[in-house]
UniProtKB/Swiss-Prot annotation:
It comes from Mus musculus. Residues 68-77 have a biased composition (Gly residues). Pfam families: DUF3432, DUF3446, zf-C2H2. This is Early growth response protein 1. One of its GO terms (biological process) is response to hypoxia. GO terms for cellular component: chromatin; cytoplasm; nucleoplasm; nucleus. Belongs to the EGR C2H2-type zinc-finger protein family. The gene is Egr1.
């Protein structure tokens, strides 16, 4: 009897542990509360058997009471409820585990329901140690090989070294959840134990969407090795593309300008000029201006250098002029001095100084939005825009012609002033000529027409009337005392009227009369000509 009891006590732990080892595994069994209960029962089985064996020894034998009729009814009840007559444990003590625990798991534990959808769960407590070794050891191997074929072979070897059941359960802890998730997705198993990012991956069941959103590409490419290898090989492709995309954008506006500013500020300029060049870019707000500026960024440094060299060449000539030329305002009223060492210009207003500094730096912050042309002054930009719009607000007061700039109108009015000056000069030159002309034609008018008028009527009445003989013979007798002439004149008048009557042209008679009376004309008209002259 004692030997039989000892055999039962020795066999019962083995038979109790065997059902746990050979219990059929299924996806519904893979849940943490059931695993905890099974582990507790497997650890507490000897104590349970010891507690069950003491009543057998003290109160009576279950087998002897049934076979040989010994006492100890209480012991027989306990023995019959726990074990079969053949010494095998009955299934009644575990029926409540197989029914109640499954219902509780299905209703309460959502994590278990999420993870039951993955059939390939190959991790228990021993595989956790293996996965830790695997994640730490193959880092150099993955560094040597960029492809995951040898790693798959390592994984298959480690899995074959472990227990064959694929749907077994793991330890009841967050680490177990992380290991199970790692076994489900090999990319996560590589990264969980390697560094301190295990909480991120252990939270995969509770936060499924962040893992799918944040680590979709690293999972597929971080599988060859640990997180260090994933950072070494696959991820540089992404930062490289980002860096290649960002680098051409930033230097287009900032880095070349800063270098140009340093090169400009080193020879003979103050350091704050570089700051102005840096602040030049935010004013170019439109995208088109940014593109235009990016295309011109390479040649802009050369332009700036050329402007500095030109300013250096121009400055000495100004240096020779300014000390000799007095300024309109005294120096104490011009507190803003040019910071360039080779320039001694001073200004009474800060905006004038700012405008002047742009000459040294070559800065043109005002840009036309239509043609993208840059200007150093805002008023220049305003007048330039009028060339595009066609606006001409300045009109000439004399001719009404319109202009887009006031200086153009001034230049045009000077043309009118010159024309006025020319007209005035012409009038001054014409007035002496007119006076000289009035002096010369008066003798002609008095000398020639007056004899004609006097000569024409005088012969006509003399020709028709008889006093012709009396008029002419008297001067003839006085001027020519010879009687022959008087006789001739006396004889001529009788013939003269006949000619006049036949030919009414007074011109002929006048010509003859003037020829005959030339001495009288000179005597009568000589004083008149003297008076006019």
């Amino acid at each position: 009897m004692a030997a039989a009891k000892a055999e039962m006590q020795l066999m019962s732990p083995l038979q109790i542990s065997d059902p746990f080892g050979s219990f059929p595994h299924s996806p519904t069994m893979d849940n943490y509360p059931k695993l905890e209960e099974m582990m507790l029962l497997s650890n507490g089985a000897p104590q349970f058997l010891g507690a069950a064996g003491t009543p057998e020894g003290s109160g009576g034998n279950s087998s002897s009471s049934t076979s040989s009729g010994g006492g100890g009814g209480g012991g027989s009840n306990s023995g019959s409820s726990a074990f079969n007559p053949q010494g095998e444990p009955s299934e009644q003590p575990y029926e409540h585990l197989t029914t109640e625990s499954f219902s509780d798991i299905a209703l309460n534990n959502e994590k278990a329901m999420v993870e039951t959808s993955y059939p390939s769960q190959t991790t228990r407590l021993p595989p956790i140690t293996y996965t830790g070794r695997f994640s730490l050891e193959p880092a150099p191997n993955s560094g040597n090989t960029l492809w995951p074929e040898p790693l798959f072979s390592l994984v298959s070897g480690l899995v074959s070294m472990t227990n064959p059941p694929t749907s077994s359960s793991s330890a009841p802890s967050p680490a177990a959840s992380s290991s199970s998730s790692a076994s489900q997705s090999p990319p996560l198993s590589c990264a969980v134990p390697s560094n301190d990012s295990s909480p991120i991956y252990s939270a995969a069941p509770t936060f499924p969407t962040p893992n799918t959103d944040i680590f979709p590409e690293p999972q597929s490419q971080a599988f060859p090795g640990s997180a260090g290898t994933a950072l070494q090989y696959p991820p540089p492709a992404y930062p490289a593309t980002k860096g290649g995309f960002q680098v051409p954008m930033i230097p287009d506006y900032l880095f070349p300008q800063q270098q140009g500013d340093l090169s400009l500020g080193t020879p003979d300029q103050k350091p704050f000029q570089g700051l102005e060049n840096r602040t030049q870019q935010p004013s170019l707000t439109p995208l088109s201006t940014i593109k235009a500026f990016a295309t011109q960024s390479g040649s802009q440094d050369l332009k700036a250098l050329n402007t500095t060299y030109q300013s250096q060449l121009i400055k000495p000539s100004r240096m020779r002029k300014y000390p000799n030329r007095p300024s309109k305002t005294p120096p104490h009223e011009r507190p803003y001095a040019c910071p360039v060492e080779s320039c001694d210009r001073r200004f009474s207003r800060s905006d004038e100084l700012t405008r002047h500094i742009r000459i040294h730096t070559g800065q043109k912050p005002f840009q036309c939005r239509i043609c993208m042309r840059n200007f150093s002054r805002s008023d220049h930009l305003t007048t330039h825009i009028r060339t595009h719009t066609g606006e001409k607000p300045f009109a000439c007061d004399i001719c009404g012609r319109k202009f887009a700039r006031s200086d153009e109108r001034k230049r045009h009015t000077k043309i009118h002033l010159r024309q006025k000056d020319k007209k005035a000069d012409k009038s001054v030159v014409a007035s002496p000529a007119a006076s000289s002309l009035s002096s010369y034609p008066s003798p002609v008018a008095t000398s020639y027409p007056s004899p004609a008028t006097t000569s024409f009527p005088s012969p006509v009445p003399t020709s028709y009337s008889s006093p012709g003989s009396s008029t002419y013979p008297s001067p003839a007798h006085s001027g020519f005392p010879s009687p022959s002439v008087a006789t001739t004149f006396a004889s001529v008048p009788p013939a003269f009227p006949t000619q006049v009557s036949s030919f009414p042209s007074a011109g002929v008679s006048s010509s003859f009369s003037t020829s005959t009376g030339l001495s009288d004309m000179t005597a009568t008209f000589s004083p008149r000509t003297i008076e006019i002259c």
